[in-house]
Design a protein with these regions (language model features):
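Conserved beta-propeller blade repeats
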Residues: 12-27, 59-76, 102-118, 156-160, ...
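A short beta-strand motif characteristic of beta-propeller blades
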Residues: 4-10, 53-56, 96-101, 177-181, ...
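Short, solvent-exposed loop/turn segments at conserved positions within beta-propeller repeat blades
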Residues: 37-42, 80-85, 160-166, 206-212, ...
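Short loop/turn segments that connect beta-strands within beta-propeller blades
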Residues: 49-51, 91-95, 173-176, 218-222, ...
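Cap/lid segment of the alpha/beta-hydrolase catalytic domain
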Residues: 374-494, 501
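Predominantly five- to eight-bladed beta-propeller fold
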Residues: 43, 124-170, 213, 261-264, ...
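Active-site-proximal cap/loop segments of hydrolase catalytic domains
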Residues: 452-646
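A short loop-to-beta-strand structural motif that recurs across blades of beta-propeller domains
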Residues: 44-46, 86-88, 168-170, 213-215, ...
């Protein structure tokens, strides 16, 4: 059998966005594969019907948009003109897709009302809200070489400059498109109930607003009414059960911007709490084998079915109208997305020994049916090293992590080891297949990873490390590393490597400025200074001060607190050879963060290297261009090789 290699990325199949037809008898989804020739990804539409999986498009980069009815789908494909959207109709009986609508703006979301009209969320410019009516060629001619920004956020990772960008509601009646909301506010979340659409709006000021108001659009009368008119809550995840609107709402007073929203409803203009979930109602398990997304929740049989992250894996749970929670599925898996209809739940899953596949769960019987086997041949022909659980105690907490042994491990032989730190910090590692870790195991490394204080999966209190970045979280990691060395004596403690991205990149920078126990490190999309991060990153002004426990007064105390938690403050203590990986379009953890750390090491004579990936953003390791993903992993692996096997 072969071992896992960096180039194996080209063989992986990714599954996205499973959606049932209105009658629940057909299931559409997207299959994505690497397009090596064009350094991108092919996305094609597939359908599961009568137990058969059938391909409906071929190499067209199709995105599934909406079931028009049980016999017809509306899909989109890449339009020839930038900034526009081409929509087509495709019958479940097959045949060519028929052009339906050409929208002169980027499509964000499409809904169908019971009266046959459609409501579209589209992106426009606030200072030119009707510029979409002008031909694209004319708009391109008007583009200036100067970008002006006068609001926050003015850029967003994955989107670029977004100054004055607004998501507005449009209605499609008899083939005519009309804008129905103003461009001063931004439409965020939506849900349809018959001929009504509920949606949230956030205001755009020179500063960032984290709160939303709640509105209702009546598709019959065209009237818009505000049903919650106070800037007091972050309102997300709208859904309808038996004609009643529910949503998650948080005032962020107890646990800050990462606080889990309560399930609520509206009564007489007041937010009423139904229940407080004890876990995040989405999948937050880190992965590098998932390309796109899909639904995290769906309504069926008068209840909400949702993904939830529990410690180190994803569950499916049910919330009744009164807030009662029932666990529907709980196994050692990562569930990426789901949909529900007709007593069945379709979901995309991976496990310690498998990549993504599509499954269907019968809620009545508990029977699980595997619908696809796209990655089966790869798994069957490849040696995969299964993670072994390691339990440990740290400052009164019972924690656990995992160790992956080197492929071909021989007891008594000494091996190097890689400590891998997840991002977030409010995400988790699980035991499911992780490409980069399997590559390092195949290259002869032990690989260890864990969920420290600040991770998701255990509720808000455990996830809360505001004002203590580099404190208890760092100590947990070092105690875990001690436990791993104690449990696996064949690890050479003189050949320990460390890496991590985003929060894991922050932690890498913190580690190299606080200990010399690692022979080398690879810091990815990292944070060097909470001051520069807070004043440059897309989410910086709110996230930086919140996470560091600093006031937004921007006085000396604010800067002192931000600087206290900044790895750059301690750069004089760093001696570890460190590689930095950054993308020049990453506005979440900007390139300037890696540059500061790299230069700080270089001027002190510490061995360092910075790799800048052009045209990539914060998602390089997960959905970047295939060639760049391969180059990134090769750079890190070569850096480890250089410092452990020379």
């Amino acid at each position: 059998m072969k071992t896992v290699t960096i180039e194996d990325l080209k063989q992986f199949v990714f599954i996205e966005n499973p959606v049932y037809a209105p009658d629940g008898k057909s299931l559409a989804f997207i299959k994505a594969t690497v397009d090596e020739k064009n350094n991108g990804y092919h996305r094609d539409l597939y359908l599961v019907k009568d137990g058969m999986v059938r391909q409906y498009t071929a190499k067209e980069n199709t995105s599934f948009v909406l079931w028009n009815d049980e016999t017809e789908m509306i899909i989109s494909r890449k339009a020839e003109t930038p900034g526009t959207t081409e929509l087509l109709k495709l019958s479940v009986d097959g045949g060519e897709a028929i052009p339906w609508m050409a929208l002169p703006f980027p499509l964000v979301k499409l809904h169908k009302l019971d009266n046959g009209n459609y409501v579209v969320i589209g992106s426009v410019k606030a200072d030119e809200p009707d510029a979409w009516k002008v031909k694209a060629q004319k708009k391109e001619e008007d583009q200036s070489s100067c970008t002006v920004v006068d609001e926050l956020p003015y850029w967003m990772t994955g989107s670029g400059y977004i100054n004055k960008d607004r998501n507005c509601l449009f209605v499609i009646r008899d083939g005519t498109v009309d804008r129905i909301t103003g461009a001063d506010w931004n439409v965020d979340e939506t849900v349809v109930d018959g001929n009504r659409m509920y949606y949230t709006c956030s205001k755009k000021d020179p500063s960032i607003c984290l709160y939303q108001k709640l509105y209702c659009y009546d598709g019959n009368t065209g009237e818009i009414s505000c049903i919650y008119d106070a800037w007091t809550h972050s309102i997300q995840n709208l859904y309808i059960v038996n004609g009643t609107l529910y949503f998650q709402a948080s005032d962020m007073r107890e646990y800050g911007v990462n606080e889990t929203g309560k399930i609520c409803t509206i009564k007489n203009g007041t937010i009423v709490t139904v229940c407080k979930p004890d876990r995040s109602m989405y999948n937050s398990v880190a992965s590098d084998i998932a390309l796109g997304g899909g639904k995290q929740r769906a309504v069926m049989d008068g209840a909400l079915y949702s993904l939830e992250t529990d410690e180190d894996h994803t569950m499916i749970v049910r919330y009744d109208e009164d807030g009662k929670k029932t666990i529907i599925k709980d196994a050692e898996e990562t569930l990426f997305c789901m949909d529900a209809a007709d007593h069945r739940i379709a979901y995309v899953s991976s496990s310690p020994s498998s990549l993504q596949e599509l499954f269907e769960l019968d809620v009545n019987t508990g029977e699980v049916t595997k619908l696809t086997d796209f990655n089966g041949a790869y798994v069957q022909d490849t040696t995969i090293s299964i993670p072994e659980r390691v339990d440990y105690e740290s400052e009164g907490k019972s924690l656990h992590g995992w160790v992956i042994k080197p492929v071909g491990y021989e007891k008594g032989k000494k091996y190097p080891c890689v400590l891998d730190v997840h991002g977030g910090p409010r995400t988790v590692y699980g035991s499911s297949f992780f490409h980069e870790m399997q590559v390092w195991a195949a290259e002869g490394y032990f690989v260890c990873f864990t969920n420290i204080k600040g991770s998701d999966g255990r509720g808000d209190a455990f996830a809360d490390i505001r004002g203590d970045y580099g404190g208890e979280d760092y100590r947990d990691l070092m105690i875990f590393m001690d436990r791993v060395l104690e449990t696996y004596p064949d690890i050479d403690e003189n050949r320990l490597c460390e890496t991590g991205g985003s929060y894991g990149g922050f932690m890498t920078n913190w580690i190299i400025t606080h200990t010399d126990r690692f022979c080398c490190a690879a810091s990815q999309r990292s944070i060097a200074s909470w001051i520069s991060f807070s004043l440059i990153a897309d989410i910086g002004p709110e996230f930086g001060t919140d996470q560091c426990g600093a006031k937004k007064s921007w006085d000396d105390a604010t800067f002192d607190k931000l600087w206290h938690h900044s790895p750059l403050k301690y750069i004089r203590n760093a001696h570890t050879p460190t590689l930095f990986i950054h993308s020049d379009q990453d506005y979440r953890c900007p390139l300037s963060e890696g540059m500061q750390m790299m230069q700080g090491l270089a001027v002190q004579g510490v061995e360092t290297r910075l790799c800048i990936f052009h045209g990539e953003n914060h998602e390089l390791s997960r959905s970047g261009k295939p060639a760049n993903r391969i180059r990134r992993l090769r750079e890190i692996t070569d850096w480890f090789e250089q410092h452990t096997k020379a």
